[in-house]
UniProtKB/Swiss-Prot annotation:
GO terms under cellular component: cytoplasm; DNA-directed RNA polymerase complex
Region (Alpha C-terminal domain (alpha-CTD)): 252-328
GO molecular function, one term: DNA binding
UniProt KW Cytoplasm keyword: no
Protein name: DNA-directed RNA polymerase subunit alpha
InterPro entries from the UniProt entry: DNA-dir_RNA_pol_insert, DNA-dir_RNA_pol_RpoA/D/Rpb3, DNA-dir_RpoA, RBP11-like, RNAP_asu_C, RNApol_insert_sf
Region feature Alpha N-terminal domain (alpha-NTD), mapped onto this chain: 1-231
UniProt note: domains: The N-terminal domain is essential for RNAP assembly and basal transcription, whereas the C-terminal domain is involved in interaction with transcriptional regulators and with upstream promoter elements.
Enzyme Commission identifier(s): 2.7.7.6
Family under the similarity heading: Belongs to the RNA polymerase alpha chain family.
Amino acid sequence: MIQQMQMPEKLEVDEASYSNYYGKFIAQPLERGYGVTIGNAIRRVLLSSLPGTAITGIKIEGVLHEFSTIDGVKEDVPDIVLNLKQIRFRSISKRNAVVTLVLRGPKDFVAGDIVSPEGDFEVLNPEHHIATLNEDATLKIDVSVGRGRGYMPAEDNKPETMPIGYISVDSIFTPIRNVKYSVENTRVGQRTDYEKLSLEVETDGSIAPDEAVSMAGKIINDHVRLFSLFSPTQEEEVEEEVQQEDEEFENMRKLLMTRIEDLELSVRSHNCLRSAEIDTLGQLVSKREDELLGYKNFGKKSLAELKELLESKNLSFGMEVTKYRLNQ
């Protein structure tokens, strides 16, 4: 008899250390080898596949390329771009936005100066330094903020129509700062070779750690679930279902191709259908009751007779029959 696999009983959260930025999660007991398998999969998905918000590009008035300097600004453009990449956002509207800023010195340009008039996002590190302007400096800058997953290099971040002076930025969309996992042995009964998985998740505060883990688990589950559809039993069931549907289709097609003259109908009903140029059962069921009553000499008695006939064959008036290709 095959022993049933040991499944983890629950996912525990270390409440003492939990915050909006950090969470430690423990799953046990796991079969040997599953700690690394699950831990590594969740770690990779957390770092690469969760959605987030980041700056995707900028345009600075008077600057034509990313290697320029700006009069009255201490930092050059590469330094400004580097500082902008480190700003963390929480998306509110889940849509892209462009913010235009006009800054005059003397001033310390910080992340908190980037405010969406429409309330599309919130800056999570508003004190983060971007640039220093002296008393003569004026800086006009358009900041594009967008949504994405994981990491997007600048060359893949370029819009289809890029205005002169637009500078694409490497975008770090992922809300995950770091993920670590460790695997230890744990006891179940007399056996000590089961595993305990400890997963530590650090976020930028735009998403709670437990929400991030839940999202990663769903992404993995959605992918892995597809592979469970190909068991031999399910394949046989699907094949039988398809064969049954094909059989039903052909039986219905043959029934609808039945000639009216082969049906047991009164002479009056036969004559009415012949004068209406209705030759097959398929042509009959495609008609509505009011259409039939509009034909010459077609009365309610004939309609009642035909309705009873159709019901005996599990048919009805007004059916859609084009899919049965009755003209072929």
